[in-house]
Amino acid sequence: IQMESGDTPDFALWPQPGAVVDAATRGYLTPLEDLGIDLDQYQNDFSSYLVGLGVVDGVIYGGANAANLKSIVWYQPAEFDARGYSVPATWDEMIALADQIVADGMNPFCFGMYSNGASGWLATDWMEDIMLRTGDGVDSYDKWVTNELKFSDPIVKNAATLLSQIMHTEDYVVGGTDAIVSTYFGNAQDPM
C-alpha cells in the first residue's frame, strides 16, 4: 500500500520472493546495478539460486538476506527410544506414527501460528516446504511464488491437503486445532 501511494521506502524486506517480482514488475524497485552494487561480486558471494530470487526480466532487483527452515519436524530422540518409535522416512510413515502417538495418549504436533497482525505466515512456511517436496520440486515452487502456478492447480491443492492432514486433525495438535491460531509462534515448541 505504501508503494502504491507513491511513498516508496529506500529499503524493503519481504518474507516471500514473489513480492519482489510483483514490486519490480510494477516499477517500484530500482535495479541493484543502478545503486552502485558490484553485480559480479554479488553473484560471486551468493548462490545462483539465491541471486535468482531477486531477478525480474534479467535485471537484479534484490536478493535473499536470510534462508530459514521453519517447517522442520523436531522430535526428542530419547522419547522415541523409550517408546520404541522409529523416525519416519515418508509422509505416510509420519501419519502412521502420529496415529500411534495419539493412540498412546499424546499429541504428536505442536503448532503456533499467532503472530499479532502477521498471523498466517507460519502456515505459508509449511506450505512452501510441502510444495518443494511433493510437486515438481523447485520448478513448481518457483512457478508458484511468481504466480505462474495458481492456488487452484492440483499440485498446490495437494500440498494444502497434506498440510491440512496434520493441522486439522484435532488429536494431532497440542490444545486441539483451535489452539494453532491462539498459540504464539515463539511458544509453539514449549510442550516439547
Language model regions located:
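Aromatic-glycine-rich donor-binding/catalytic loop that engages nucleotide-sugar donors
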Residues: A78-P88
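Early extracytoplasmic/lumenal segment of secretory-pathway proteins
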Residues: I1-V20, G186
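Short, solvent-exposed loop/beta-turn-alpha elements that line the ligand-binding surface or hinge
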Residues: T30-F46, S86, M113, L132-N158
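Stable alpha-helical elements in mature extracytoplasmic
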Residues: Q16-A19, Y28, Q76, T90-L97, ...
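Hinge/lid segment of periplasmic solute-binding proteins
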Residues: P15-S71, I95, I101, L122
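Glycine-centered hinge/linker elements that transmit conformational signals in sensory
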Residues: A98, V145-F185
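Extracytoplasmic/periplasmic solute-binding protein
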Residues: V56-N65, S71, I95-L149
